[in-house]
């Protein structure tokens, strides 16, 4: 399969490493635009952007979701991991199999950002991960797999 990955934080790196070692081809990485960092406030790309650049994988840093049109249409799917942007349905429908998300909670619990942190703050002793089809809502769509972690 030809896949894209939409991710920003370093928590995505182990999954990216696994994907490039699999039989699938990572054709494109989508990440957040560069942001000011450090004392000099110089623009710095995300950890995921650095990871992709080091492996000669094309990186796209769209400011608007419509910048993805024409860039992801030929992909079989896009895997998202902490990308941080709610995408409209017309974008989610572009790849052949849509967007598949890896989310760090047992959905429907803890939809949205920082689910593992919120579970810990609430004293949960069991949480997990979910793999599901992205739809236009916040972490909605059919769940394909879940794994519990205690």
What are these regions (language model features)?
Residues 1-150:
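One-carbon transfer enzymes
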């Amino acid at each position: 399969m030809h896949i894209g990955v939409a991710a920003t934080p370093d928590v995505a790196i182990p999954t990216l490493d696994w994907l490039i070692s699999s039989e699938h081809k990572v054709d494109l990485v989508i990440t957040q635009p560069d942001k000011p960092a450090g004392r000099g406030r110089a623009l710095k790309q995300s950890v995921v952007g650095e990871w992709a650049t080091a492996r000669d994988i094309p990186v796209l840093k769209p400011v608007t979701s419509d910048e993805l049109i024409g860039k992801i249409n030929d992909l079989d799917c896009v895997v998202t991991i902490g990308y941080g942007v709610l995408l409209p349905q017309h974008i989610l429908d572009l790849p052949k199999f849509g967007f598949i998300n890896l989310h760090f909670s047992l959905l429907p619990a803890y939809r949205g950002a920082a689910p593992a942190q919120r579970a810990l703050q609430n004293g949960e002793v069991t949480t997990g991960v979910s793999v599901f089809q992205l739809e236009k809502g916040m972490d909605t769509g059919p769940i394909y797999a879940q794994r519990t972690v205690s």
